[in-house]
């Protein structure tokens, strides 16, 4: 037995800090002493007792990330856990729709079972494919949902991104929702900018949460209508400012802090960084509640410093900067846990998750755009305008003459999406504003179907990048002046790898090589959302440009 003596317990049940002592036996909390009776209790215990005097340090439950896509870290779960445990996260709720779009059910089962210490819970992907406006590698049907929904650690139906299908009562979409209801499971939402009658209609079908709010009015309306509000602060989307709504309401129980997507280079200490940012709006205790008791109440977990609960907690030296003294995971100190994980042999990756880039090699001519590079025509052209720290894009309109000038200045880039699952030969072609100042980038990580996305203005560099990407089995490529500048192989589904240390080193080298190429801090993650048609306003898939959930022509 280990007794943590003289600690300040962060009581997430009451929002207090309470002086006390906590005893741990194996992986459980055996008792919590709030009456300073620890010495008397120890005397009665016949077994060996190790006493650790924390000298007033804070004891908090470990954290829950209630909405994250592990694939965005580019690590398989057994590598991902080595990073997030160091951040005090012991439970994650994932929606593995990235790998599901590539490998279907087999991909979901791999994500569910690969981690060894981290508790991984799954919300089953509801929208695979996300829409019929792109080509996916797999489909998850209502029948598939019913096959999987009663598995251990499956909590319900993942973010229902195709909200128009819900509002318009699409039969297949409603079947999936009904399966979740049938088994009393949770249903996560995803409804950017939805309000009023449409939001009510969406909620009426059983949607319980949302993480897509972009302004305070939107967040407040969703919260007031009964949705659990997930406020995300990740690598691509940074919405922590929405906590400003806490000045207008009196009850924060239905607010959670989540990450959604975190790149590996931001993964170390990511949840601690979220908490630090949150204290600009709420107290440290309230912030901790938003990553412990609040998500626990939604997902049905039992957390908190309580007898019988899992002995997983973070020991803080202070709450001003959330400086960590140590972390205990299931009764063991973090270093011991990490040593065990590092000694474990790697599991074999299922064959279906490997060698997933099935398109033919491309030539320079594949990266010419009709009406601009050949068979020129006058007119007005749609251009995607990306927004920093947001998944939302805007539509800009330029004349053909303006486009030519801006292309020459690299103020506008060409953007392509190459279908990679079924060798259809599809290439979506478009233009994007003010993203890449030099070189060409190509990636097989592109939401949600994860076709290959490429951006640049030099056809030779674009072809080189896309072909090299096929050779390495997927990942990230940067090319310039006819040479591959740097690359990161991600052979698992073309979106993940199985060596965290190597990937961390390689991605840092990649970003160092392309420094100054883009004004976007994380261009590969940012460009991965340019192909996500369920997010407004103008996106691109392998089938072409998408606006308002409809395919539109490049020329107006």
Swiss-Prot record:
It is an enzyme of class 3 (hydrolase). Keywords: Hydrolase, Manganese. It catalyses: adenine + H2O + H(+) = hypoxanthine + NH4(+). GO terms for molecular function: adenine deaminase activity. Its cofactor is Mn(2+). One of its GO terms (biological process) is adenine catabolic process. Its EC number is 3.5.4.2. CDD domains: AdeC. Belongs to the metallo-dependent hydrolases superfamily. Adenine deaminase family. This is Adenine deaminase. It comes from Methanocaldococcus jannaschii (strain ATCC 43067 / DSM 2661 / JAL-1 / JCM 10045 / NBRC 100440) (Methanococcus jannaschii). The lineage of its organism: Archaea, Methanobacteriati, Methanobacteriota, Methanomada group, Methanococci.
